[in-house]
Regions:
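Short loop/turn segments that flank or connect secondary-structure elements
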Residues: 1-37, 44-46, 50, 56-63, ...
Length: 297
């Protein structure tokens, strides 16, 4: 299984998992003794849909949001990048914290909505389907667990608006899990593939420019009606970005290539296969020679 994704991207230990039917006792509301405490020392990983919602709420481009409000981090060594919410300058508090609570509450990130629950997306190496489980986070400062309010995780997710957030980030989680479960079999990502991944997942406005470019038209045979609809709908464009990445990173073709581009791609694949076959034959010959030499010793 892969390691959990958010909010424990670096944890080597798998927390105790529970299902959506698990009942928690929890409430967070103004007036509770720990109000705003969890927002004073943040470590919040953002999903691509989080970035989309927050940049729209702030009325800025995704490029500006990434520059001013996030910091990048590696999900795994030599792997794809994630982004975390940048705290206040020279501090650890969330930049959106106010005495009355969150300043962008309606568009708050997934991790904030889930707290004190953690989403654990898993995928077995021989499966494509990801499976969601949950873990309960208990921190010393949090008084919410002392409130006698029982609710299942499934109902808590509905209450916090997480069904929409999880569904629109599922394509991204599947990409992350596929990369993590594939491991060395697909090799270390190239700089170009890491840049494409980061742009398509997080910088949706730059990705729109990328899809609008003539070079994209020359490579992909995307119907003009579909393309026009994508360019005016951030959410649809983000889902398309996940399809695009599955194709360019893992070869799962769902976007048609232009005939000339398809021929060129086929030629490159055949050339790569020929090189691999030659290398394999060379390796077998060297092994056979080594075994023959040992036989004469």
């Amino acid at each position: 299984m892969s390691r959990p994704d958010i909010p424990f991207p670096q944890s080597p230990v798998l927390p105790t998992m529970v299902e959506g039917t698990h009942v928690i006792e929890f409430s967070c509301h103004k007036g509770i003794g720990c109000w705003n405490a969890c927002c004073s020392n943040i470590d919040i990983s953002l999903t691509p849909y989080d970035v989309l919602r927050m940049k729209t709420r702030l009325g800025i481009s995704s490029t500006e949001f990434l520059k001013d409000y996030t910091v990048p981090y590696e999900m795994d060594k030599d792997s794809i990048a994630g982004v975390k919410l940048r705290p206040v300058d020279a501090g650890t508090a969330c930049r959106f914290i106010k005495p009355e609570g969150c300043g962008i509450y309606e568009d708050r990130p997934t991790a904030c909505r889930y707290y004190p629950v953690a989403l654990l997306s898993m995928r077995k190496q021989d499966e494509y389907v990801d499976r969601d489980s949950y873990a309960i986070v208990k921190e010393d400062h949090c008084k919410g667990h002392e409130v006698n309010r029982r609710i299942t995780i499934a109902d808590y997710r509905k209450e916090q608006g997480l069904e929409e957030y999880d569904e629109l980030a599922r394509g991204w989680r599947q990409l992350v899990l596929k990369k993590q479960s594939s491991g060395p079999s697909i090799g270390k990502p190239t700089l170009r593939s890491r840049q494409l991944y980061f742009m398509a997942c997080y910088d949706i406005d730059r990705f729109r420019e990328f899809v609008s470019a003539e070079s994209f038209n020359k490579l992909f045979d995307l119907p003009q009606e579909e393309k026009a609809a994508l360019l005016v709908d951030d959410v649809a464009l983000l889902q398309f970005a996940f399809r695009f990445l599955r194709q360019v990173l893992f070869g799962e073709e769902s976007i048609a290539l232009n005939a000339e581009a398809a021929q060129e791609r086929l030629a490159k694949v055949q050339e790569k296969r020929l090189i691999e076959e030659r290398e394999a034959a060379k390796k077998r010959a060297l092994e056979a020679e080594s075994e023959a030499d040992e036989g004469f010793d």
